[in-house]
């Protein structure tokens, strides 16, 4: 499994099928980049200059909304993930 370092988080992107109002399914080339995912792994947290570690706000299993162009896409074990900083998460869906 991927284990992120520092304040990084591994997200499994949730892709929704996009349809127009008339029911036409859009091809991948016409879809917007997804912004929702599920947290699958979290790093230990950010370390300040004085050595103090800042705790994480996100936990494994959280559904989150993140910045549109945030993170780095990686493929691991046949699945695609996004590794991003915790500050790129905009909201947690509860």
UniProtKB/Swiss-Prot annotation:
Gene Ontology CC: cytoplasm
Subcellular localization(s) per the UniProt record: Cytoplasm
CDD domains: cpn10
Biological process per Gene Ontology, one example term: chaperone cofactor-dependent protein refolding
Cited InterPro entries: Chaperonin_GroES (IPR020818), Chaperonin_GroES_sf (IPR037124), Chaprnonin_Cpn10_CS (IPR018369), GroES-like_sf (IPR011032)
Nucleus as UniProt keyword: no
Listed HAMAP family: CH10
Quaternary structure and interacting proteins, as annotated: Heptamer of 7 subunits arranged in a ring. Interacts with the chaperonin GroEL.
Function: Together with the chaperonin GroEL, plays an essential role in assisting protein folding. The GroEL-GroES system forms a nano-cage that allows encapsulation of the non-native substrate proteins and provides a physical environment optimized to promote and accelerate protein folding. GroES binds to the apical surface of the GroEL ring, thereby capping the opening of the GroEL channel.
Descriptive protein name: Co-chaperonin GroES
Organism annotation: Bacillus sp. (strain PS3)
């Amino acid at each position: 499994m991927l284990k992120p370092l520092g304040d990084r988080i591994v997200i499994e992107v949730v892709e929704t099928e996009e349809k127009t109002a008339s029911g036409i399914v859009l091809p991948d080339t016409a879809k917007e980049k997804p912004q929702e995912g599920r947290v699958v792994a979290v790093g230990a947290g950010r370390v300040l200059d004085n050595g103090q570690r800042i705790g994480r706000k996100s936990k494994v299993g959280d559904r989150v909304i993140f910045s549109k162009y945030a993170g780095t896409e990686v493929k691991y074990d046949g699945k695609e993930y996004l590794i991003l900083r915790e500050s790129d998460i905009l909201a947690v869906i509860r």
